[in-house]
């Protein structure tokens, strides 16, 4: 889809259409926000977060949120955008009991771990 490929102009058109559900899931329960976050498409993540119909805490079939996907892949700019959105819960866990900070640490993404540690909303266990 457009979000997965980073096509911001197409995402803008789709979000303008009230008939389009921005939280619709694809295979494995991925939403547009999860796909954009996983690929590191910061401009698309920005567009999606600006839309109040987007639920940034939705989780895939295995419980990964957009923040967890960005943390797994080490996309620091996307993690920054997600943490800045007051709706994002940084402490949600996937089915393996892992939070975004755990995933970033396991994948050795030090810059993402530092961002998460600096955020007061992140609970350090």
What is each PLM-predicted segment?
Residues 27-28, 61-62, 95-96:
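Ankyrin repeat start-site detector
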């Amino acid at each position: 889809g457009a979000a997965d490929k980073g096509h911001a102009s197409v995402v803008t058109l789709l979000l303008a259409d009230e008939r389009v559900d921005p939280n619709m899931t694809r295979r494995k329960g991925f939403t547009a926000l999860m796909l954009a976050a996983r690929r590191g498409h910061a401009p698309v993540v920005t567009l999606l977060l600006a839309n109040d119909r987007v639920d940034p805490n939705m989780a895939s079939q295995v419980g990964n949120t957009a923040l967890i996907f960005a943390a797994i892949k080490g996309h620091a700019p996307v993690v920054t955008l997600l943490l800045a959105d007051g709706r994002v819960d940084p402490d949600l866990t996937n089915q393996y009991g892992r939070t975004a900070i755990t995933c970033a640490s396991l994948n050795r993404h030090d810059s993402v771990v530092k961002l998460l540690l600096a955020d007061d909303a992140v609970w350090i266990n």
